């Protein structure tokens, strides 16, 4: 559903931010 899509998008964005902060 829409909520699922939004959650997935936010999760991906959050993961990108975490990856950027963590050298790996």
Swiss-Prot record:
Pfam families: Antimicrobial24 (PF16049). It is found in: Secreted. The keyword Secreted applies. Expressed by the skin dorsal glands. The keyword Secreted applies. Disulfide bonds: none annotated. Keywords: Amphibian defense peptide, Secreted. Its main location: secreted. One of its GO terms (cellular component) is extracellular region. It comes from the Eukaryota. One of its GO terms (biological process) is negative regulation of nitric-oxide synthase activity. Inhibits the formation of NO by neuronal nitric oxide synthase. Belongs to the frog skin active peptide (FSAP) family. Caerin subfamily. This is Caerin-2.1. It comes from Litoria rothii (Roth's tree frog). The lineage of its organism: Eukaryota, Metazoa, Chordata, Craniata, Vertebrata.
